[in-house]
């Protein structure tokens, strides 16, 4: 292999190229970074190479001693990561340089084994399988964090099952609801995301297709020694066992369903967490002040305003939720891959996939802290219910009056009464009490119940109970 040209004088070294999250604080310092960084991808590709040799040894395609030597050498700390990365500029993918470096490392230990490195394989098999290994490791972490966030949200929903608050539609007070129901909605989203992550993680496939999807290089003339279908089954089953990945129906070099599935699940997960974040931001506004993020000394400080306590956690999560769907769109566009290997579409997946994984991983880790430490001000929620002087119960009053006045008449009466109350600065109850058509239609106790926002939350409590029951494991 021709050595790539040396970097020009003044080119940055590895330390200067460190991507530590300066412009992406949602994932900076979180565990997912270590699982998707360059060295993690390098190790995953080496793991794919080593697993392949072991699978080939198990099926008699190469000596067991060679597989052992290759596995022993397949360590990222024995490979010059920066050289592999820069060498990829000459080959359009990092596997060519990786194979050369791995072969050299094996040759130093066992010259005979070096002949079996990358036997029959192709760059895309190695990189795609490595990508699935990276994704599986990251998804396991993301799934664990989603489960922890869901536990915290379930506790919030249970604790505030009957805590009344204003439901808001199109940014305005609509009808009373409960904070428990809002938290249950968050719980449902996170639980659904966790389920999707788990199902996807367990079904991620390895890639094995050879140069153009026929696996010809893996078998050579071996097809003369037995049924090709049997040989294929043995190799695929062995590789599945060695990688822990699922066996695909066909080589998927240009059938990019696994990547599209990752894009969809990660976009949904980030969006689900983003819904929580934007709700917290809305409820934490100074004018609303119904919730607050966990109080940590020094967090949320402004560079200019000493009094500020900014909603940092929800801001970080929301930033990821706005990025991942856009990146996922780029990944799904790569479904349009020409021929048996794309010139550019496959290559366009790598960085967006890494970003989707680490942004979602950072958001999931941040969501655990947000959900577990969220401060809820039930008294403020109750006070905010009274901001419209009772008009927030207009729907429930209209429903109660419908059997007596008719649906249209009841709605028109409440519309006029609410308008009068708002413009005259009076309560809805006062205005309704002066209407002659309502004189004596309902007993006083019934009016008091109808005009109490805390008693107009519908079946919110039952809905919360249902969400919590779905979260709990079935009794055995």
From Swiss-Prot:
GO-annotated molecular function: lyase activity
Binding sites annotated in the UniProt record for fumarate 1: 137, 140, 201
Impact noted for substituting residue 341 to A: Loss of activity
Pfam families: ADSL_C, Lyase_1
Pathway: Antibiotic biosynthesis
Subunit description: Homotetramer.
Stored NCBIfam families: protocat_pcaB
Name this polypeptide is given: Nitrosuccinate lyase
Organism (species): Streptomyces cremeus
């Amino acid at each position: 292999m021709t050595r790539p040209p040396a970097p020009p004088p003044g080119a940055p070294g590895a330390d200067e190229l460190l991507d530590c999250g300066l412009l992406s604080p949602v994932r900076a310092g979180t565990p997912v970074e270590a699982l998707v960084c360059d060295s993690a991808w390098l190790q995953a590709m080496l793991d794919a190479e080593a697993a392949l040799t072991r699978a080939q040894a198990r099926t008699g395609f190469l000596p067991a001693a060679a597989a052992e030597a290759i596995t022993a050498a397949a360590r990222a700390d024995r490979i010059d990561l920066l050289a592999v990365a820069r060498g990829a500029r000459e080959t359009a993918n990092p596997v060519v340089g990786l194979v050369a470096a791995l072969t050299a490392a094996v040759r130093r230990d066992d010259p005979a084994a070096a002949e079996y490195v990358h036997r029959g394989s192709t760059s895309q098999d190695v990189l795609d399988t490595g990508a699935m290994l990276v994704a599986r490791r990251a998804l396991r972490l993301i799934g664990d964090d989603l489960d922890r966030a869901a536990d915290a949200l379930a506790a919030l929903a249970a604790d505030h099952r009957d805590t009344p608050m204003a439901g808001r539609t199109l940014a305005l007070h609509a009808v009373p609801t409960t904070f428990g129901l809002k938290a249950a909605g968050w719980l449902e989203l996170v639980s659904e995301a966790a389920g999707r992550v788990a199902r996807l993680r367990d079904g991620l496939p390895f890639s094995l297709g050879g140069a153009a999807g026929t696996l010809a290089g893996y078998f050579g003339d071996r097809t003369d020694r037995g049924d090709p279908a049997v040989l294929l089954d043995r190799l695929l089953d062995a590789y599945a066992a060695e990688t822990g990945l699922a066996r695909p129906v066909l080589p998927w070099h240009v059938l990019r369903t696994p990547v599209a599935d990752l894009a969809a699940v990660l976009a949904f997960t980030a969006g689900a967490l983003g819904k929580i974040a934007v709700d917290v931001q809305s409820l934490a506004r100074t004018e609303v002040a119904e919730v607050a993020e966990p109080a940590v000394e020094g967090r949320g400080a402004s560079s200019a305003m000493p009094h500020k306590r900014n909603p940092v956690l929800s801001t970080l999560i929301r930033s990821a939720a706005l990025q991942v769907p856009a990146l996922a769109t780029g990944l799904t566009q790569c479904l349009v891959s020409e021929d048996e290997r794309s010139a550019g579409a496959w290559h366009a997946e790598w960085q967006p996939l890494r970003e989707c994984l680490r942004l979602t991983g950072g958001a999931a880790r941040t969501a655990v802290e947000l959900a577990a430490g969220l401060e809820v001000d039930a008294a403020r929620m109750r006070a905010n219910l009274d901001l419209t002087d009772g008009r927030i119960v207009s729907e429930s009053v209209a429903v109660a009056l419908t059997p007596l006045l008719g649906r249209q008449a009841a709605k028109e009466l409440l519309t006029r009464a609410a308008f009068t109350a708002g413009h005259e600065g009076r309560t809805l109850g006062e205005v309704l009490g002066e209407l002659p058509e309502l004189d004596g239609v309902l007993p006083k106790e019934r009016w008091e119940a109808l005009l109490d926002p805390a008693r107009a939350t519908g079946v919110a409590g039952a809905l919360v109970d249902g969400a919590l029951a779905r979260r709990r494991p079935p009794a055995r």
